[in-house]
Regions:
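Catalytic core of membrane glycerolipid acyltransferases/transacylases, capturing the structured
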Residues: 29-86, 94
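Membrane-anchoring hydrophobic helices of lipid-metabolizing enzymes
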Residues: 1-34, 43-47, 52, 78-79, ...
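Short, basic, glycine/proline-bearing loop/turn elements
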Residues: 9-10, 76-82, 111-115
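Residue-level detector of anion-binding/catalytic polar loops
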Residues: 80, 104, 136-138
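A cross-family acyltransferase "interaction/gating" segment
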Residues: 117-169
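A conditional alpha-helix N-cap/helix-loop micro-motif detector
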Residues: 85-89, 121
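Residue-level preference for the first positions of well-ordered beta-strands
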Residues: 32-34, 104-108, 140
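Catalytic-site beta-strand/loop segments enriched in glycine and acidic/polar residues
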Residues: 98-128
Length: 169
């Protein structure tokens, strides 16, 4: 319900302010998948959700709950909040549970936004592979070409799914 309402309220202003095109929509599988995305700005997940009309579980940093409004929105969109200071086993278990239920998980494996636009990707944390292997889930790369700027088109590319089958036990 909340995602539907957000789409209605945000579609026109964001389509004008941040026109976005998504390439590779057909690469998305029907069932569970881990959407592994680079992280250019706070708009990344908003633009993806707005233009794909896809329901996903978002792995988000716990600090986002400090803003009551934003925390409320993310919680009701089904976000899993992770404490980046240590090994947050409960957040990892919640992500794995969502995947076992056939849901999609949207994750930023760098754990933070990449400020340097000349780089494609920052250092990736190890949790992504562990979650994919333990849940036998395909990984799709989602690449935000550049940081969104007002009235400049943004492109999002979705890669073909791949699995780490050689590591499945």
């Amino acid at each position: 319900m909340l995602l539907w309402l957000a789409r209605i309220l945000l579609w026109i202003p964001l389509s004008i302010l941040h026109p976005t095109y998504i390439y590779g929509r057909k690469n998305r599988p029907k069932g569970k998948a881990i959407l592994c995305s680079n992280h250019r700005s706070n708009w990344d997940i908003v633009l993806y959700l707005l233009h794909t009309k896809e329901k996903v579980v978002i792995l988000a940093k716990k600090e986002l709950t400090k803003n009551k409004f934003f925390g409320f929105i993310l919680k009701h969109l089904g976000a899993v909040f992770i404490d980046r200071e240590g090994n947050d086993i409960n957040a990892i278990k919640e992500c794995m549970k969502a995947l076992k239920e056939g849901k999609k998980l949207y994750i930023f494996p760098e754990g933070t936004r990449l400020k340097d636009e000349s780089k494609i990707l920052g250092e990736i944390k190890s949790g992504l592979a562990m979650i994919a292997i333990k849940t036998k889930t395909p990984i799709l790369t989602v690449w935000h070409e550049r940081k969104p700027k007002a009235f400049r088109r943004s492109n999002i590319y979705i890669g073909k799914p791949y699995e780490l089958t050689e590591f499945y036990g």
